[in-house]
A protein has these predicted regions:
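Proline-centered loop/turn at the N-terminus of a beta-strand
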Residues: 133, 310-312, 423
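Intein/HINT protein-splicing elements and their conserved insertion hotspots or analogous self-processing inserts
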Residues: 1-105, 117-223, 231
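Cysteine-centered functional microenvironments
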Residues: 97-109, 310, 341-342, 346
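Short helix/loop capping segments that flank catalytic or ligand/cofactor-binding pockets
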Residues: 11, 17-22, 73-76, 122-124, ...
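Conserved acidic residues
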Residues: 6, 268, 425
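N-terminal beta1-alpha1 cap of cysteine-dependent amidohydrolase-like domains
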Residues: 150-316, 320-332, 340-348, 411, ...
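Amide-donor transfer/coupling interface in amidating biosynthetic enzymes
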Residues: 137, 260-262, 303-304, 337-472
């Protein structure tokens, strides 16, 4: 966390002298060594672990990293790699060891933690009471470097330069796997595309703001059905998101629809979840779409549902591919949009930034102007759209046009579309996997401990409220 009113501490778990045997540093010199670090006192190790757990449970640690391959300097660098700004100024004068090579590269078990200065006395007391040794290392700085000093010697490590060195092995492997120059694009862009957040002023992050609670045990009367096919795997997260937002959730399989056991007449919202229907052997969602198109009862149930004026639908990932395949988003278009393989021709699983443009949709309309983080996990997520962008009701765009911020190469960087009337929505990213701050790959530091939910829950609440108005 780039905050000057914080301090970094080293906590040793080994109770041993610093040793280089078996370290990455030794291996880089073509050696192994025979003097390796060890945990000398198992009880001390336990005490150190439990003391750190107490700090974690009390919310006293802002950031932390273990010391493992590469030693202390690698730990410090990797803590900086998580941000695009700032660095550290580190003094090793309080370390008993005088050999700076051992201090920086020994892999003795330990951790580095970052503590707010207002909590440092409480942290020190917890560690001292547990008999755990710790050393103050230094503080964050606005400069993009790590400045390490020991006595009269000072060493400077450029964070961005070292980050590229650190990432270069991944790039070389990626180059063997990715197509269309995506490996090079990732290497050039990964540090230029931070996930940015911008919440609407009225968002408070509390369940009470939406009048919802996870403790609800009585039916709301607003029913949604999750439709799944063999290979669907995202239904549980989706069911909980809908339930938390106030829906009564029903499980409907394709077999139910094909046999006529379910007709969708008793629900006002249907959701097609993510996964790999029919193992994608015919292409993503092709077999699933065939289940609707070539089975009379399933097709009749779907057609009647979309003919009603009091219905909503949502397709996520594999469900988005299904909706596009069935032409449910833009049935008025002569040329149908398609979902194609990612430009990289790899399965992309990553946490990306989304921007919600001003849009006409039931679920995302109130989120217009927001910037949020979200997970993607797909192999065929590229929107191929035959018309100009203004012909579509765009509800979500990747925050960056270039790969990997746009993980699939979608036209116009589109991540989600809605029907012209805003009732039916298809998107590749998984909003149901980001409704809580702890689910997010990153989240605003000043909110992650206070927010109960993220703005994504609002989309589900909007859907429930819209239906309540329609069926009143």
């Amino acid at each position: 966390v780039n905050n000057e009113k914080t301090t970094l501490y080293h906590i040793d778990f080994s109770f041993d002298e610093l040793k280089l045997g078996g370290s990455a540093f030794a291996q880089s010199l073509g050696k192994v060594g025979d003097d390796v670090p060890c945990v000398q006192d198992a009880e001390y190790f336990r005490d150190a672990f439990l003391a750190v757990q107490e700090l974690v449970n009390k919310g006293l640690i802002l950031a932390g990293h273990d010391i493992s391959a590469g030693g202390l300097i690698t730990t410090l660098l990797e803590m900086c790699f998580a941000n695009v700004e700032g660095g550290m100024e580190i003094s090793l004068d309080k370390m008993k060891e005088q050999d700076i090579i051992k201090i920086l590269f020994a892999e003795n078990p330990g951790i580095v933690i970052q503590i707010s200065d207002k909590h440092k006395e409480e942290v020190k007391k917890i560690l001292e009471d547990a008999g755990v040794g710790f050393v103050k290392l230094g503080k964050p700085t606005d400069e993009r470097h790590i400045l390490v000093s020991k006595g009269d010697a000072t060493y400077q490590f450029g964070v961005d330069y070292m980050r590229d060195v650190w990432y270069s092995s991944s790039y070389l492997l990626d180059r063997k796997q990715s197509m269309n120059g995506c490996a090079k694009a990732r290497f050039e862009n990964y540090k230029m595309q931070p996930v940015e957040f911008a919440f609407m002023p009225e968002f408070k992050g509390k369940l009470s703001q939406y009048g919802i609670t996870p403790d609800r045990r009585t039916p709301s009367g607003i029913r949604a059905a999750i439709i799944r096919e063999k290979g669907t795997n995202g239904e549980r997260e989706m069911a909980y998101s809908l339930y938390l937002a106030g829906f009564d959730v029903k499980d409907v399989t394709m077999t139910d629809l094909i046999s006529g056991r379910e007709t969708l007449e008793d629900v006002n919202m249907i959701v097609y979840c993510g996964g790999f229907s029919n193992s994608d052997v015919l292409g993503s969602a092709k077999g699933w779409a065939g289940g609707f198109l070539f089975n009379e009862k399933a097709k009749e149930a779907l057609d009647k549902f979309y003919a009603r004026e009091d219905t909503l639908s949502l397709g996520i990932c594999n469900g988005c591919q299904l909706m596009m395949e069935l032409g449910l988003i833009n049935p008025e278009h002569k040329k149908k949009g398609k979902m194609l393989h990612n430009d990289s021709h790899k399965f992309e699983s990553t946490f990306v930034g989304l921007t919600i443009p001003t849009n006409r949709s039931v679920m995302f309309g109130s989120l217009s102007g927001s910037k949020l983080g979200i997970w993607v996990a797909h192999g065929e997520g590229k929107f191929y759209l035959p018309y100009d962008e203004d012909k579509y009701n765009v509800v979500a765009k990747y925050s960056y046009d270039e790969y990997p911020g746009n993980p699939n190469g979608s036209d116009y960087s589109i991540a989600g579309l809605a029907s012209a009337d805003g009732r039916h929505l298809a998107m590749m990213p998984h909003l149901e996997r980001a409704i809580f701050p702890w689910q997010n790959g990153c989240y605003p530091a000043d909110r992650k401990n206070s927010d109960q939910v993220t703005p994504w829950i609002e989309a589900f609440v909007n859907a429930r409220k819209w239906i309540e108005e329609k069926v009143r």
